[in-house]
Amino acid sequence: MSSSSDAIKAALEKGRAAGLSATGGKNADYIPFLASVPSDLFGLAVVTADGQTFKTGDADFAFAIESISKVFTLALVMEEIGPDSVREKVGADPTGLPFNSVIALELHNGKSLSPLVNAGAIATASLVPGDTADARWNNILECQCGFAGRRLKLSNEVNQSEQTTNFHNRAIAWLLYSAGTCYSDPMEAVDIYTRQCSTLVTATDLATMGATLAAGGVNPISGKRMVSAGNVAPILAEMTMEGLYTASGDWAYTVGLPGKSGVGGGIMAVVPGELAIAAFSPPLDPAGNSVKAMAAVAAVADSLGHNLYTTRGKVSS
């Protein structure tokens, strides 16, 4: 169902109202930089599969991409080795556990299960093509820039803040390595993973990146193909299963769209063939998802009638 410009503008207003009225949550405080971001910021954007952009609020405020970066590194690696190899080497199942849990590793002989939780994302980072750590990082950054349709930058402040507190991720990497499921030097993989989470994006960027997936892998602004059309479906499937951490099932149940969140306060949701919705607000719920961004994206999707599990048209009784 294609949405008109007027319908999208009206949906943005509803999303803005829903986001601003949502209460609760607090900034992530285990990463010093994230704790310092003003908690009253709120931005919302929609980018369509044909390149139209709509936005409101602080949609151009730059914040840390954090775990949303996992989607695009997954796309990069999937292009390199294919979805079947990703499923074999990293996994393709929900864990039902917090994003930084090691329990799934212990229960499944060191296999991470999902590329959208920390263990799987570190394993995915270890599969990024490149002869050196810097080459691998540059490939990730170029991928993110291609999806966003503009030059993105690594925040040294965010990266340093994360590098000094990522002991848990280092432990995860060694567990992966001991099981043979980290495919490069484990500390190099953690370094690359940490850097990929430290890129600065805006809600408008995230909507463009999501719209690239909605458009079958082609950036609707630049026209550049970023991922094969055949790889989009498994990426969106992973987003559905694990995109909002332990709230992924509830999100699928209530909103019905593939989504991905990050502890920087961003959320991106994709309507295949149509558009992407993205929002930003720093205060998070206990699962690590932005309270206001979730409410805003859900309201926009509902206003436009975008739920992949809703039957449309005439149905025989």
Curated annotation (Swiss-Prot):
Root EC class: hydrolase
Q: Name one GO molecular function term.
A: glutaminase activity
Keyword presence, Hydrolase? yes
A Pfam family recorded for this sequence: Glutaminase
Q: Which GO terms describe its biological process?
A: glutamate biosynthetic process; glutamine catabolic process
Give yes or no: UniProt keyword Hydrolase.
yes
The record's annotation in InterPro entries points to: Beta-lactam/transpept-like, Glutaminase
Q: Where is the signal peptide?
A: none
Source superkingdom? Bacteria
Disulfide connectivity for this sequence is none
Q: Which Gene3D superfamilies match?
A: DD-peptidase/beta-lactamase superfamily
For this protein, the Enzyme Commission number is 3.5.1.2
Keyword annotations from UniProtKB, A to Z: Hydrolase
Q: Which reaction does it catalyse?
A: L-glutamine + H2O = L-glutamate + NH4(+)
**Binding residue positions for substrate:** 67, 118, 162, 169, 193, 245, 263
Describe the protein's quaternary organization and the partners it interacts with.
Homotetramer.
The UniProt similarity line reads:
Belongs to the glutaminase family.
Q: Which PANTHER family match?
A: GLUTAMINASE, GLUTAMINASE 1
What's the name of the protein?
A: Glutaminase
The beginning of the lineage is: Bacteria, Pseudomonadati, Pseudomonadota, Alphaproteobacteria, Hyphomicrobiales
